[in-house]
């Protein structure tokens, strides 16, 4: 199907879905939405009942029970549309907006509208727009983007939800440790805002937030920095406002503009920077890694020492289109995304921190950088060295019956023998330091 047959604005997308809902059952509407997403390389996340185990691209659409039944056997209430690949030049504004866009699958209206996904290259076109003063420049803050929206759950009643890039509600999700996102947001709001919010905990719904003075016709996008999510403890925790959107008119307003309706007491994202030359901006963050290391070495706990790069925000999105938000990441942010934030394995929140530290220890080109940024984990490095020394000795003696490391010894020996390598100390040492064994090591780490 050609791109011309699909809508190119959010208003047209909603109108199309609403029209189709009048003439089809929900599963057929979702089927059309799947085709839209596949055409534009987007992801669609439905209720978990619709996603079979191991299937990544396409959610299962329930079959119609009877010809007269207008509801599928497992009815979907919410859907989130997100990116499957980085933004490309010349994309439509609609596809960049599918960056955690939450839809009510009963009415096909918007529940949460996040900022557009950013373009991530300083192309000639971006440089041209920059020279002609199309962009505001703000420093990047290393945090997690969430959109707060109101939802009257058909089963459990109303509450405020937290949408992320890939989830329509992460209120009960834990990243590191046992605090949920709802608990982290509540904690930051208590410290940094004046809003009237309560936190509810129960067995049925888990942790939920209730805002007493927010307008349910709006959604509110915020950034949060909490050390359970961003463990670089020398950059303080914080919460900041990014935008709010009227869900009736689909009009978005930013904190610094007239008419902004936000969460009371939360500061704006960050002040706008002077219009430096773009090459100067890029040069200024090249030293970000060394600057951060030196600050930590000297015990400086101030966000001013941590340069994560810059965000270029267009003053004329109708002209700049898919390059309306441009993310220029510093080497420090690139390193943190690769070493800490990438979710490559299905690790529980109770083991995630251990796994992150272990992986960085095993990767020689990451090891020293990581501990320089996270010196609070130096005792973990000592523990891992003791573990690897034991594994090396057990492999050297071919102790496959070791009481708790036998499986590790067997696996590494098997890999060495399959590669037809000589089993000497150097070879063993090179093998056991490979990060591919991190999951195996995680299973025995409690013995050290």
From Swiss-Prot:
Top-level taxon in the UniProt lineage: Viruses
Keywords: Early protein, Virion
Induction trigger: Expressed in the early phase of the viral replicative cycle.
Chief location of this protein within or outside the cell: virion
Places the protein is found: Virion
One Gene Ontology cellular component: virion component
Family assignment from sequence similarity: Belongs to the asfivirus M448R family.
Protein name, per record: Putative RNA-ligase
Taxonomic classification: Viruses, Varidnaviria, Bamfordvirae, Nucleocytoviricota, Pokkesviricetes
């Amino acid at each position: 199907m050609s791109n011309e047959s699909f809508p190119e604005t959010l208003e047209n997308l909603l109108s199309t879905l609403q029209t189709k809902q009048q003439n089809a059952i929900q599963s057929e509407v979702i089927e059309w939405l799947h085709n839209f997403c596949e055409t534009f390389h987007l992801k669609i996340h439905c209720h978990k009942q619709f996603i079979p185990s191991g299937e990544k691209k396409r959610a299962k659409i329930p079959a119609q029970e009877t010809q007269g039944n207008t509801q599928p056997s497992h009815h979907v209430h919410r859907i989130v549309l997100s990116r499957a690949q980085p933004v490309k030049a010349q994309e439509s504004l609609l596809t960049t907006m599918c960056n955690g866009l939450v839809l009510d699958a009963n009415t096909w209206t918007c529940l949460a509208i996040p900022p557009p996904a950013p373009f991530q290259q300083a192309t000639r076109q971006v440089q041209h727009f920059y020279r002609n003063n199309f962009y505001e420049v703000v420093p990047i803050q290393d945090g997690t983007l969430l959109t707060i929206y109101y939802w009257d759950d058909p089963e459990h009643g109303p509450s405020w939800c937290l949408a992320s890039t890939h989830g329509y509600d992460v209120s009960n999700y834990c990243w590191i440790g046992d605090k949920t996102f709802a608990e982290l947001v509540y904690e930051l709001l208590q410290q940094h805002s004046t809003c009237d919010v309560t936190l509810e905990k129960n067995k049925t719904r888990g942790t939920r937030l209730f805002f007493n003075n927010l307008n349910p016709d709006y959604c509110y996008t915020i950034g949060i920095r909490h050390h359970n999510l961003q463990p670089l403890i020398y950059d303080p925790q914080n919460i900041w406002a990014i935008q709010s959107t009227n869900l009736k008119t689909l009009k978005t307003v930013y904190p610094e503009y007239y008419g902004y309706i936000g969460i009371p007491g939360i500061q704006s994202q960050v002040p706008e920077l002077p219009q430096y030359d773009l090459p100067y901006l890029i040069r200024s963050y090249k030293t970000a890694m060394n600057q951060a290391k030196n600050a930590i070495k000297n015990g400086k706990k101030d966000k001013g020492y941590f340069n994560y790069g810059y965000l270029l925000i267009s003053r004329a999105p109708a002209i700049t289109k898919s390059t309306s938000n441009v993310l220029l990441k510093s080497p420090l942010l690139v390193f943190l995304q690769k070493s800490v934030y990438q979710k490559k394995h299905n690790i529980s929140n109770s083991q995630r921190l251990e796994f992150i530290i272990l992986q960085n220890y095993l990767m020689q080109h990451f090891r020293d950088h990581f501990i320089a940024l996270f010196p609070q984990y130096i005792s973990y490095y000592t523990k891992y060295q003791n573990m690897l020394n034991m594994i090396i000795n057990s492999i050297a003696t071919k102790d496959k019956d070791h009481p708790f490391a036998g499986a590790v010894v067997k696996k590494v020996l098997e890999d060495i023998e399959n590669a037809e390598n000589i089993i000497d100390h150097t070879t063993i040492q090179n093998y056991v330091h490979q990060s591919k064994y991190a999951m195996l090591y995680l299973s025995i780490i409690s013995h050290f």
